């Protein structure tokens, strides 16, 4: 029996190590999310190892910068391991709360990490994937990048600090992205201030090689920026599609309630904007009404909160959301059974002020 347990432990530890590759290349620390078959989604062990690695490298005088990237070309990170969360919640375990708490602690720590932290956002960057990049000093997108906070589609709300980073997008772009969960590409990510640099994907290996060759005397944010520029990188967005709808987004998503936003979209008469309004309304109609409200409110509140206050608000809301929200049903309908027919708990007209205060007292 003891031998069997030992072998099982070895297999488990090997899997942990395989899921996350940690390397030192000269003065560069390199973290690779290594679950390409699962779009590099995060589990609790990976979160713990990333956090521990960063803490060690913070104290390591031979490490001058850190890069985090995903294995493969399809995804940087598709967020948290949804099926594991569903299993924990369904069975009355507490693993999901451990996951959320430690994930949020890691995300907040990244904002305060004292050395250059470089996130290569190549491929899909979804949900929790956004959490481990938005605090980076260099958020690098490529032509393959697809960014989204899709939580409202699965009966949840944008977390991992979204109340902070979405509320700081220009105008009300963050509210639009958080409520609808639409996917944006590289140019829109730059425009929305959710990325800092564009670099062609075929230059990424050269960028990593260049970073690995830097010496202690030449390492710094200025040198990293120069290297990106030399490889064809740029900070300015070129023809972002969001800019074409910016005035419309700001006028509609600055409204204080989901009901008012939906009504404004429904009443759109301008022929140039009517299709966009119809498409946006159609997206919202498929998502959890409570999630739409939660997304709009947390991003609204986040405008007036510090980073620490945003994370504190979100973790309190998570604990309540597990009890009253639509997360289990959303995961069932979209990911497990894939019938795409979630039965949400509430209609938007049922979510009166008094009902919301009873359901989500921490944000209403």
List PLM regions with ranges.
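Glycine-rich beta-to-alpha active-site loop
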Residues: 110-154, 176-177, 181-182, 186, ...
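Conserved CoA-thioester-binding segment of acyl-CoA-metabolizing enzymes
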Residues: 14-69, 94, 108-109, 362
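Glycine- (often His-adjacent) and acidic-residue-rich active-site loop
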Residues: 70-105, 155, 348
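Short hydrophobic targeting helices and cationic amphipathic motifs
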Residues: 4-7, 13
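Long, low-complexity C-terminal extensions of enzymes
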Residues: 265-272, 276, 284-364
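Amphipathic alpha-helical blocks and their helix-capping loop/short-beta junctions
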Residues: 200-283
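Hydrophobic/aromatic residues within transmembrane alpha-helices
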Residues: 68, 81, 132-133, 188-189, ...
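Contiguous mid-protein beta-loop-alpha structural module that forms a pocket-lining wall or clamp
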Residues: 161-164, 168-219
